[in-house]
Amino acid sequence: RIPQYVTTIPDQTRVLPFLLQLLEHDQMLYGNKSKVIIFTSTTALTSAMHKMLESITSSLPGQEKTSVLCLHGMLSQTLRSRVSQQFRAYESAPSILLTSDVSARGVDYPSVTRVIQLGVPCSKEMYVHRVGRTGRRGREGRADMLISPFESGFVAFQLHDIPLQPLSMEDHAKSMNELVASNEAQTTFDASRVQTAMDHARYCVRETMDMRHLLNTVFNSYVAMRQLLRVSRLQILHPVQNWIRAVFGLE
C-alpha cells in the first residue's frame, strides 16, 4: 500500500544533495505537516547525519521552523523517551528524526509522511519494520531507500518480493519540477542556498566528530551482513570509504 522506492547512487558526491531533495520534496508536499524519519546503520552515523542536517535546515523549504532530532541506543532511556515524545508531538512545523533501528519497531509515531533509509537494513524483517513507521492508520506515506551499487544484491535477493520501484535521480528531479509548476507545492525554497549550507554543515561535522571511528563503525556494520550482500570485505571497504569522504567532504 505504501509507495516504496529505491535509488541506486554510483556517484557518492550526489548522496547528500539527493537526500536534501527528498526532504525538500516532502516539505513542498506537506508544508508544516512534513514529518520524516531517516534510518541509518550505526549510532555514529546517526549522530553525524544529525549534526549535518541541523546545519542545513535553513536551506530547506521549512527553513528555521524545521526541527531535527536524534535518537539512538547510546542515549539514556530518559532522553530517548523525551526525544520520542517531542517528535510525536510535532504537528505544526516540519520535523526530521535521525535514528538507528531503536525506532524501527515498538514505537508509534503518528502522521509520519516519509521514511528514508540511508543504505540497506540488516534484514528483510527490519526493512518491513522501518517502512511500517509511515502510512499508519490509513494515512498517506512513502518510503525511499538510497543505496550504493554494492548493496544491490541485498535488494535483489532479500527484498525480491517487496514492491520496490526503482527511482532515478533524474526522474525525481522531474517530479520536483512538475510539483513546482503545478502550483500545488505547500512552500518553496531557494536552491542556491543549499550548496553553501552543505559546505558549512560538513565543516561542523568534521570539526566535532572522529571520522575514522565513523568509517570503522559503518564498515563493520556492512561486514557483519556481507553474506546477505553477497560481496567480499574488499568490495565493501572502498565504496564505504568513498561514501564517507563524499558525504562529509573529506579530502
Residue ranges, per PLM feature:
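Conserved segment of the helicase C-terminal RecA-like domain
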Residues: 126-180
